[in-house]
């Protein structure tokens, strides 16, 4: 991001001041003013749920489309082997800068969390838990989430989909890479890992390339009678009807994961396997759920160790309606089973098909959901169920929120409320992906969700978040307050816009709720901030006051934007630009907005740059790869002057030289081409300055330090790199940085540090 990204605006009338959102804040006793920095910033509104599921239903899909445009379009998902290969190549080919000897360090948040996909616990010591993060690797806690440590830092892939622990040998843990949550930001993996020492070290046991196992592993099941008998389930392409050899489905190993065989009784082509459960007391009995968008979807059972399978249909809806389905079997009475199923036939494939109960080992089923789940949605994304270890009628399940029955489904009650304040005992983060109730502590409930780990010690009545120390936040962008050395933050996936006003990694708080968006600080006043979330909604913060200053665009225009880019005029922080498929500008700090451009190329605006050297020059790029400019501060606009030199994919970031407004740099998303380009004439002509030196991965961030205009910093899926413009040589700044995608770069002048926001491992700092 340009260094002027730290420029920001103010607010006018006071609206509402919300109480603290529960994270630790070092303030002067309730005024919102931080003692160390002197900055006052009170939280704005959390994203509230409207009646019915419609508000939240589209979020993960809208996010997916936005994410895909910046990472993989026109293909469905990132070629993960290309990422690994390119990262390895540049580590060897590009040297580190000789003048930088310090190491990257994580600067938070460590108290916010991020998307977790799975959780397991030690069978004899339920306080010892391991979780997998969608973009942050595997983490271990010895004390039920009070403290955390990661031993996954140096692995080539941080995208985790499933964990399983061998009950007979608890030091043996399996990890399936590649998230299987059916959104386009569910990044693929490279195969199945194994640890023989309780998660301290890991080895790649079975690679997807060698064995053909799925690139998105969502479940690992270990036979309780034979630890060498493993089953895994996963997804391949995002649509099961697609062809190719990157198949999902169920895979079987009888030699502890060395070799694998794909089951084809559902389909020889692509299908999904969501849940696999071994009968706890009956040898060779296995249950599993599948989706193939046809008559063979649903719940299946084998009674001979997997040689033959029977489709269980009695009392269940038409098989073709079964989408993602989670399965649970009672440990105290294995005849009782529950299934929590997504309706593949619903309009957006996100609604609940039903909660189904069997009292006879799966022979017959009954829908016990009633009308309770009418407002529950997004079941293809968050989908999990668990049965109490000692009470087969005590069941917890859910997606966005969690729901409880204590009488086998006769009645239900909602037990978590994501739209409450974070310090409310009924609050747990939204989008639940895995539930665990340890046999040794049957009333303890662990929930792995988009906010990290929530824990109940009383069977779900009250909840606390146990994510402190779990630095797995998935950022979209970040900014720093240039007037303070202690204030910075960013917009995060499903964790709002979060900031710290003390410089402490453990004192972040939620400034704005929901999915975080763009954040921009006023360069002269750290207490003045703009922040956005989806659908062009923009809020302005002035210390203790906040105000909705969303541009007056038609609803159809707002709905076309997942995350609105915001930037300030470097010469006047009261002049702010944002965009949908056209450019909006305010000259009075957000009080009034005007659409200053026509529709550009029909796609969403991806970046806006107001040149510090001449603020009349405004450059705009789009998701379709378009490039437009205004020479009069936004009054008039050029046609699309994107050059054939540019690849035609999303231009993710624009940056101009602090000394020359005509010198423009651009980064481009996706794979298969160069990614960094320079124009010396304001975008009329372009040249490739990547020249194959940089990794062929999506690029997201650009930065020129005002103190060092001869260097250009870029952030991409493989790390951080710097160009010496005089020599044309690139250098690698990635040493000691986790293998997570770097989505934003900002230089913090007062702290003399480069900050990198990652999608999965929080924010990191490199001191100069």
Model-derived features with residue positions:
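Cationic, low-complexity basic patches in intrinsically disordered or flexible, solvent-exposed regions
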Residues: 24
């Amino acid at each position: 991001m340009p260094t002027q990204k730290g420029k920001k605006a103010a607010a006018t009338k006071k609206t509402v001041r919300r109480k603290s959102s529960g994270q630790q804040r070092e303030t002067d006793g309730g005024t919102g003013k931080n003692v160390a920095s002197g900055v006052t910033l009170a939280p704005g509104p959390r994203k509230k749920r409207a009646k019915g599921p419609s508000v939240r239903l589209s979020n993960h899909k809208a996010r997916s489309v936005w994410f895909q445009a910046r990472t993989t379009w026109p293909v469905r998902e990132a070629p993960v082997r290309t990422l690994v290969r390119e990262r390895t190549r540049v580590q060897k080919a590009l040297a580190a800068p000789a003048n930088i000897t310090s190491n990257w360090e994580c600067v938070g948040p460590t108290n916010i969390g991020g998307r977790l996909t799975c959780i397991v616990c030690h069978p004899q010591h339920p306080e010892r838990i391991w979780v997998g993060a969608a973009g942050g690797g595997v983490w271990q806690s010895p004390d039920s989430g009070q403290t955390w440590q990661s031993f996954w830092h140096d692995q080539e892939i941080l995208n985790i989909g499933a964990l399983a622990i061998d009950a007979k040998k608890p030091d043996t843990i399996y990890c399936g890479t590649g998230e299987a949550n059916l959104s386009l930001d569910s990044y693929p993996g490279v195969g199945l890992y194994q640890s023989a020492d309780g998660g301290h070290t890991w080895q790649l046991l079975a690679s997807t390339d060698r064995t053909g196992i799925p690139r998105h592993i969502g479940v690992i099941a270990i036979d309780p009678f034979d630890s060498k008998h493993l089953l895994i389930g996963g997804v391949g392409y995002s649509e099961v009807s697609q062809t190719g050899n990157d198949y999902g489905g169920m895979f079987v190993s009888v030699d502890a994961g060395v070799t694998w065989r794909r089951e084809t009784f559902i389909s020889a082509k692509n299908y999904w396997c969501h849940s696999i459960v071994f009968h706890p007391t009956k040898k060779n009995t296995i249950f599993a759920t599948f989706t193939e968008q046809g008559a063979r979807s649903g719940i299946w059972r084998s009674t001979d160790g997997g040689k033959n399978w029977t489709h269980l249909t009695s009392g269940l809806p038409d098989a073709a309606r079964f989408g993602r389905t989670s399965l649970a079997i009672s440990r105290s009475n294995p005849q009782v089973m529950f299934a929590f199923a997504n309706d593949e036939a619903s309009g957006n494939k996100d609604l609940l098909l039903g909660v189904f109960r069997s009292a006879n080992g799966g022979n017959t089923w009954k829908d016990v959901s009633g009308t309770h789940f009418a407002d529950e949605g997004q079941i293809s994304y968050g989908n999990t169920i668990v049965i109490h270890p000692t009470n087969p009628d005590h069941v917890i399940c859910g997606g966005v929120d969690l729901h409880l029955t204590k009488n086998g489904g006769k009645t239900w009650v909602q037990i978590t409320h994501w739209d409450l304040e974070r310090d409310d005992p009924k609050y747990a983060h939204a989008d639940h992906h895995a539930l665990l109730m340890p046999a040794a502590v049957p009333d303890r409930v662990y929930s792995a969700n988009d906010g990290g780990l929530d824990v109940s010690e009383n069977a779900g009545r009250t909840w606390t978040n146990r994510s402190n120390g779990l630095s797995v936040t998935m950022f979209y962008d970040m900014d720093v307050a240039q007037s303070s050395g202690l204030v910075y933050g960013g917009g995060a996936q499903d964790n709002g816009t979060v900031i710290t006003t003390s410089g402490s990694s453990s004192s972040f708080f939620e400034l704005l709720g929901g999915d975080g968006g763009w954040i921009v600080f006023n360069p002269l006043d750290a207490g003045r901030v703009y922040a956005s979330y989806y659908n062009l909604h923009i809020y302005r913060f002035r210390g203790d006051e906040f105000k909705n200053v969303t541009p007056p665009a038609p609803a159809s225009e707002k709905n076309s934007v997942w995350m609105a880019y915001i930037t300030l005029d470097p010469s006047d922080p009261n002049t702010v630009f944002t965009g949908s498929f056209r450019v909006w500008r305010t000259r009075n700090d957000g009080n009034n907005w005007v659409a200053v451009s026509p529709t550009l190329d029909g796609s969403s605006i991806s970046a806006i740059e107001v040149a510090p050297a001449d603020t009349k020059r405004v450059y705009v790029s789009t998701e379709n790869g378009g490039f437009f400019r205004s020479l009069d501060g936004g009054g008039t606009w050029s046609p699309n002057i994107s050059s054939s030199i540019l690849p035609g994919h999303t231009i993710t970031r624009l940056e101009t030289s602090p000394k020359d407004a005509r010198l423009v740099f651009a980064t481009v998303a996706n794979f298969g081409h160069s990614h960094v380009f320079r124009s010396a004439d304001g975008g009329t002509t372009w040249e490739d300055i990547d020249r194959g030196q940089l990794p062929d991965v999506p690029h997201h961030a650009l930065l020129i330090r005002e103190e060092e205009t001869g260097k250009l910093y870029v952030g991409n899926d493989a790390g951080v790199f710097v160009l010496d413009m005089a020599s044309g040589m690139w250098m690698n700044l990635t040493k000691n940085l986790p293998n997570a995608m770097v989505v934003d770069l900002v230089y913090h002048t007062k702290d003399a540090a480069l900050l990198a926001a990652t999608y999965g491992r929080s924010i990191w700092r490199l001191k100069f």
